[in-house]
């Protein structure tokens, strides 16, 4: 059977399996459905509604996982994390709530580690690097003073 001939329920089962493997947002699921060959926006809407109602998709859970992973594994700052979540078209309320729950100790520990690793660079170069990582000037100054 060709991919375009899959029924709504077969598309839904495929999307559920995708969501069961890792935390995803609605934009990720839609992108994946279109990669798989789904062309019908009505079926994509049906799948998205079902994934939300069956708790396969949850914006607050996704935002929390995204924020945790970006802080823990990639040492991103708040601004870069916020931009990444906005790019995924998540609700602003969920984004701000997830950003409020950042582990401050780990967050500023990462920033201090990045500052130490770039200590040989000029001050301007280090500031530019940390800004690209999403840290604010105030956060950088706060950790540089210590």
Region roles according to the model:
Residues 1-146:
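An alpha-helical, amphipathic repeat domain used for nucleic-acid recognition
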């Amino acid at each position: 059977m060709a991919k375009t001939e899959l029924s709504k329920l077969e598309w839904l089962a495929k999307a559920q399996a995708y969501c069961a493997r890792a935390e995803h947002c609605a934009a990720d699921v839609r992108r994946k459905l279109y990669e798989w060959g789904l062309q019908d926006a009505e079926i994509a809407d049906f799948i998205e509604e079902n994934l939300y109602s069956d708790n396969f998709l949850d914006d607050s859970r996704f935002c929390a996982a995204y924020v945790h992973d970006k802080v823990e594994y990639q040492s991103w700052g708040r601004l870069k994390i916020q931009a990444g979540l906005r790019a995924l078209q998540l609700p602003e309320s969920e984004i701000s709530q997830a950003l409020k729950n950042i582990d401050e100790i780990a967050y500023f520990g990462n920033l201090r580690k990045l500052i130490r690793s770039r200590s040989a660079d000029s001050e301007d170069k280090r500031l530019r690097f940390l800004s690209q990582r999403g840290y604010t000037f105030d956060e950088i100054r706060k950790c540089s003073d210590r």
